[in-house]
UniProtKB/Swiss-Prot annotation:
HAMAP family: GatA. GO terms for biological process: translation. Its EC number is 6.3.5.7. GO terms for cellular component: glutamyl-tRNA(Gln) amidotransferase complex. Keywords: ATP-binding, Ligase, Nucleotide-binding, Protein biosynthesis. Heterotrimer of A, B and C subunits. GO terms for molecular function: ATP binding; glutaminyl-tRNA synthase (glutamine-hydrolyzing) activity. Belongs to the amidase family. GatA subfamily. This is Glutamyl-tRNA(Gln) amidotransferase subunit A. It comes from the Bacteria. Pfam families: Amidase. The keyword Acetylation does not apply.
Length: 485
């Protein structure tokens, strides 16, 4: 039996029944990483010795018949912008090359408390800015379904690790679609939770009012399991909400009778690949046949979401990334005349093109004379978009759309076409702007490439997402697909 192909809940059952040891599982994944990651590029750092040590500790507890915790013995990969004590945290940027985390992020602490085995740090677009993971300063991540195609981004390594059987579970971050879009491209399940549901403490900030940590797994049950572990109040992050975290496993039922689902026409317009549309429409029919009430709806301000997003996120990025200056830590230029020269050259040499592009845009929209015309106006648009969603959720329990307008595109295809790259997130960005939760799960295959279905619900209604996603998933077999790599 290939342990790397199994889900977290399948591995948990085997560990509980003493059919396998945690060390066996861990070594199987480490062997897999050593075998395939030179081609897939999911990992930027692998913690082999520490992972085996933790696995042996868990086996000792199992031998003593101690009760297993939620993630005992389950291999997890962590995006390289989330702090793990003693491991690198580079954000896939030269400016942080060689930086080691002195502490754990809150989500990392929670995973360790539940005895998850952290295998290492995962590849990403530099500082989480990108939609293809081509912006990594260190290596290219490739889609396990087709090595000539991108895995999506910015959490491309997180999706590749799960789809390529290099981790059972992974964590990514989602600012404008960076968990959902790569989940769609790689055929795995990925959740962007409600803003404030999961702590950002110990996560390197890109857009502070947009960033959220999100789980990825092979199926909905795995995604719900990891969400239950990492969700909840964190006193170190004042944006987290003191709201009880439900037992998401109870949401995993096939009963969706009477659930009201809206189909927003704005998500099915020009630019949507006809075969992606067909796959999503087939998925909607399945939900309807299973008892959901499906009706059309409208979110008329969605056309403005992408513009508002890039103004707000770039403004926040220009502020957040000001701390990387070549003085305290990270990359420092070797050729400088004075302190000003250190700042200028370290940042110019340390940041990649996309990061510099967004810093410049953000600085521009925050500057005197343009603040009112761009940034302030974008905040007003954001409020109207939130109102749009609230209006729709008075009538519907959830809305359904494609996750991305296309399947995974070829490596290099959009690298020099910035607008085309940005448009690959056109269906995920509005959800991030509003701060509501959404999940992506596979709903079809086109020419050997996965298609993603996005389900969106109201604030803190992740249980509704898991219910609908699980119902659909159990009616089809797309979650059982494994990349033959």
């Amino acid at each position: 039996m290939d342990l790397t192909k199994l889900t977290a809940h399948e591995l948990k059952d085997m560990l509980s029944n003493k059919e396998v040891k945690a060390e066996e599982i861990t070594k199987a994944f480490l062997d897999r990483i050593n075998l395939v990651d030179n081609k897939l590029g999911a990992y930027l750092y692998v913690s082999e010795e520490e992972a085996i040590k933790k696995a042996k500790e868990i086996d000792g507890k199992i031998e003593k018949n101690e009760e297993l915790k939620a993630l005992s013995g389950i291999p997890v990969g962590i995006k390289d912008n989330i702090n793990v004590k003693g491991m690198q945290n580079t954000c896939a940027s030269k400016i942080l090359e060689g930086y080691t985390s002195p502490y754990d992020a809150h989500v990392t602490e929670k995973i360790k408390q539940e005895e998850g085995i952290i295998l290492g740090k995962l590849n990403m677009d530099e500082f989480a800015m990108g939609s293809s993971t081509e912006n990594s300063a260190f290596k290219l991540a490739k889609n396990p379904w087709d090595l000539e195609r991108v895995p999506g981004g910015s959490s491309g390594g997180s999706a590749v690790a799960v789809a390529g059987s290099e981790a059972t579970l992974s964590l990514g971050t989602d600012t404008g679609g960076s968990v959902r879009q790569p989940a769609s491209f790689c055929g795995v399940v990925g959740l962007k939770p409600t803003y404030g549901r999961i702590s950002r403490s110990g996560v390197v900030a890109f857009g502070s009012t947009l960033d959220q940590v999100g789980p990825m797994g092979k199926d909905v049950e795995d995604c719900a399991l990891l969400t239950s572990v990492i969700a909840g109040l964190d006193k170190k992050d004042f944006t987290t909400v003191d709201k009880e975290v439900p037992d998401y496993k109870k949401s995993l039922t096939k009963d969706i009778k009477g659930k009201r689902i809206g189909i927003p026409k704005e998500f099915f317009g020009d630019g949507l690949d006809k075969n992606v549309r067909k796959s999503v429409e087939e998925a909607i029919k399945v939900l309807e046949a299973n008892g959901a009430e499906v009706k059309p709806c409208s979110l008329p301000l969605m056309d403005y979401a992408l513009s508002a997003y890039y103004i707000i996120s770039s403004a926040e990025a220009s502020s957040n990334l000001a701390r990387f200056d070549g003085i305290r830590y990270g990359y420092r230029s070797k050729n400088f005349k004075d302190a000003k020269d250190i700042y200028l050259k370290s940042r110019s040499e340390g940041f990649g093109d996309e990061v510099k592009r967004r810093i410049m845009l953000g600085t521009y929209v925050l500057s005197a004379g343009y603040y009112d015309a761009y940034y302030k106006k974008a905040l007003k648009v954001r409020k109207l978009i939130k109102d749009d969603f609230q209006r729709v959720f008075k009538e519907f329990d959830a809305i359904v759309s494609p996750t991305s307008p296309t399947t995974a595109f070829k490596v290099g295809e959009k690298k020099d076409d910035v607008m085309s790259m940005y448009l690959s997130d056109i269906y995920t960005v509005p959800i991030s702007v509003a701060g509501v939760p959404a999940i992506s799960l596979p709903c079809g295959m086109i020419d050997g490439l996965p298609v993603g279905l996005q389900i969106i619900s109201d604030y803190f209604k992740e249980d509704v997402l898991f219910n609908l996603a699980y119902n659909y998933e159990q009616s089809v077999d797309f979650h059982k697909m494994r990349a033959d790599f």
